[in-house]
């Protein structure tokens, strides 16, 4: 069994949190952040059981500034 660390990107939609794993492409949701991450972990594990792990490159996350008219 192989253990890997993946990225979870979360955002809130109305009364749910949506969680996405950009490296694998899995998405799930939950009523709390913890539930969304747990559901994403389960979805990702199921996906990796069925499909070979893709060639994964580390995700680089940063911030940037944008000027716009408000």
Give the label of every model feature segment.
Residues 16-17, 34, 46:
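Intrinsically disordered, low-complexity segments enriched in polar/charged small residues
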Residues 20, 37-38:
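Short, surface-exposed helix/turn micro-motifs that flank interaction/cofactor sites
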């Amino acid at each position: 069994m192989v253990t890997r660390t993946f990225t979870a990107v979360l955002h809130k939609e109305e009364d749910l949190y949506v969680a996405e794993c950009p490296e694998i492409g899995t998405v799930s949701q939950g009523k709390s952040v913890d539930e969304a991450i747990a559901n994403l972990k389960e979805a990702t594990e199921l996906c990796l059981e069925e499909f070979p792990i893709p060639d994964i490159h580390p995700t680089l996350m940063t911030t940037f500034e944008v000027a716009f008219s408000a």
